[in-house]
């Protein structure tokens, strides 16, 4: 009988450790999954030529994201697929002009040019963990919510 109790106790300890590790793994997975950088517009509809306010939230705890000095954003229109408007080539060297720190919320105004009416979004090229003044190299792209221009 003592061997049976010893086995039962060891089995209980192994199951407890397994469940503890499983619980911690699930919590870490859900925590890491919720870390992201989000770009949203304050309105769902804009009038052609109106200023658009963008809010950028970096919910990562350990990643800084930086933006281009040439083209910090691109306006895209949905026409079956998402297509950016044509932009002239940048006349100066493309450097990192600003960054959003981990946990930071930032906002800025975008002056919308006169463009086609329809569904649009903002595309923002980012450089992860770059430094101000450094040459910008795109490591990712983040998209805003969709909005309508009338």
Listing of model-derived features with the role each one plays in the protein:
Residues 4-21:
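N-terminal Sec-pathway targeting helices
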Residues 39-43:
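Surface-exposed, proline-enriched loop/turn segments that connect beta strands in immunoglobulin-like
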Residues 54-61:
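Asparagine-centered strand-capping/turn motif at beta-strand->loop junctions
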Residues 61-104:
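The feature marks short-to-medium sequence segments in extracytoplasmic or secretory-pathway proteins
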Residues 21-31:
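Hydrophobic alpha-helical membrane-insertion segments, chiefly the h-region
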